[in-house]
From Swiss-Prot:
Residues 381-444 form the TRAM domain. This is tRNA-2-methylthio-N(6)-dimethylallyladenosine synthase. The gene is miaB. Catalyzes the methylthiolation of N6-(dimethylallyl)adenosine (i(6)A), leading to the formation of 2-methylthio-N6-(dimethylallyl)adenosine (ms(2)i(6)A) at position 37 in tRNAs that read codons beginning with uridine. [4Fe-4S] cluster 1 binds at residues 15, 52, 86. Pfam families: Radical_SAM, TRAM, UPF0004. SMART domains: Elp3. It comes from Dichelobacter nodosus (strain VCS1703A). The lineage of its organism: Bacteria, Pseudomonadati, Pseudomonadota, Gammaproteobacteria, Cardiobacteriales. PROSITE patterns: MTTASE_N, MTTASE_RADICAL, RADICAL_SAM, TRAM. Monomer. Its main location: cytoplasm.
Length: 456
């Protein structure tokens, strides 16, 4: 007789797409078997590890975590351990050979099959592996979306077809596949009806979105944004992550036509050196990247930009790195996600000679991050005295008499106000800037009929 599984614990590594996928894993298990999430592994009957293979250290973390969970399984033989995400897709059966305590291995495109895979593992008392790429099937089998707060991610596409020389995503998530236009709008409308005020359209290469409409025509991201903006209750729209070569003039024009599209853009550049960009197979030059930002800034002078940077790519010389620093100065980035190059097996870059010493890579990364932190602090200081629209999303961690929310450029703002403002927009005067947040004073708040109650 199979043990009834009641509780699940999930640990997530990596990008926002993985966070989105983890929320869907929890939803399918709850809908199919009534399995509910718990706060610690010790309480769980199912342990899930949603993995990332973008960097080597993230992959090493997977097997370290599985080693820690092995002792739990020895004490609770009925415990089911599952590994999902990009490491699962990349390694498949090898995960079970290296960690035989794992019962289920599933990829990003097969998470909707998780309940059946767990049942199969229980019946067979052996491992089950499903890392196939069934195209858009995943989205057709997911439960109805549920709002857990005033902001929500909506996945509009999967995979990537760019094949940058350093990246494993095309191999682990497959080629680009866009969700049908009406399906995306329906999910956004459902979330809006539940109190979601801000939608973040999500994809590995989101501005390559090409979704089929009901009449057979194809919609791009620019058109999708316009339609999402027309959904009642939606007050803000973001999208991530974009590729510069797909950033069309039509998408740039949405910053003029759609006020609900926030004045902040994350657009990964990776390097400020044309030579390194060519080695990365990024398909654009620095001047083209800057031209796109200039067009957007001409429409939205107050817009802020963030980016991704890879430091120490094979063959990077000091002048290449200096070109990156020059680009940072020219753009004045608000935030960065910056890392030392990590060799990924099977990618073209893994065969390139890497003569940059690790000490040099670390020193360059420290310089880059320090400069962008200075820029971020400068932008925060410049916001003092300004009035900002803040989407209130929770009580402040410091006081129950204060609430916390985010500005369009993702600054956390704490200010005195009642909890009934959660889920509403508030105009706040910024009174002080700190390292990780801003302080403000409430000027006015959006009027809504009733406070929103979110289900978590």
């Amino acid at each position: 007789m199979q043990t009834v599984l009641k509780h699940v614990y999930i640990e997530t590594y990596g990008c926002q797409m993985n966070e989105y996928d983890s929320s869907k894993m929890l939803a399918v298990l709850k809908n199919s078997h009534g399995i509910t999430p718990v706060a610690t592994p010790e309480e769980a009957d199912v342990l899930l590890l949603n993995t990332c293979s973008v960097r080597e250290k993230a992959q090493e973390k997977v097997f370290s975590q599985l080693g820690r969970w092995k002792s739990l399984k020895e004490r609770k033989p009925h415990l089911i351990i599952g590994v999902g995400g990009c490491v699962a897709s990349q390694e498949g059966e090898m995960i079970r050979r290296r960690a035989p305590e794992v019962d289920v291995v599933f990829g990003p495109q097969t998470l909707h099959r998780l309940p059946n895979l767990i049942e199969e593992a229980q019946r067979s008392r052996g491992g089950v592996v499903d890392v196939s790429f069934p195209e858009i099937e995943k989205f057709d089998h997911l439960p109805e979306p549920r709002a857990e707060g005033p902001t929500a991610y909506v996945s509009v596409m999967e995979g990537c077809s760019k094949y940058c020389t350093y990246c494993v995503v095309p191999y682990t998530r497959g080629a680009e596949i866009s969700r049908p236009f009406d399906d995306v709008l329906a999910e956004c409308a459902t979330l809006a009806a539940q109190g979601v005020r801000e939608i973040n359209l999500l994809g590995q290469n989101v501005n390559a979105y090409r979704g089929a409409m009901h009449d057979g025509t194809i919609a791009d991201l620019a058109l999708l944004i316009e339609y999402v903006a027309a959904i009642p209750n939606i007050g803000r729209i973001r999208f991530t992550t974009s590729h510069p070569s797909e950033f069309s003039d039509a998408l740039i024009e949405t910053y003029r036509r759609v006020p609900k599209l926030v004045s902040h853009l994350h657009l990964p550049v990776q390097s400020g050196s044309n030579r390194i960009l060519a080695l990365m197979k990024r398909d654009y030059k620095v001047a083209e990247y800057q031209e796109k930002l200039a067009k957007i800034r001409a429409i939205r002078p107050d817009i802020s930009f963030s980016s991704d940077f890879i430091v120490g790519f094979p063959g990077e010389e000091e002048e290449d790195f200096q070109a990156t620093m020059d680009l940072i100065e020219a753009v004045f980035f608000d935030t960065s996600y910056s890392f030392i190059y990590s060799q990924r097996p099977g990618t073209p870059a893994s065969t390139m000679p890497d003569r940059v010493p690790l000490t040099v890579k670390k020193e360059r990364l420290a310089r880059l991050q320090a400069r962008i932190l200075e820029m971020a602090a400068s932008i925060s200081e410049a916001m003092v005295g300004t009035e900002q629209w803040v989407l209130v999303d929770r009580l402040s961690r410091k006081s129950e008499r204060e609430v916390s929310g985010r500005t369009e450029n993702n600054r956390v703002v704490n200010f005195s106000a009642p909890a009934s403002l959660i889920g509403r927009f508030a105009k706040v005067q910024i009174t002080a800037a700190y390292k990780n947040s801003l302080r403000g004073r409430l000027i006015e708040a959006e009027l809504l009929p009733d406070p929103v109650v979110y289900t978590r």
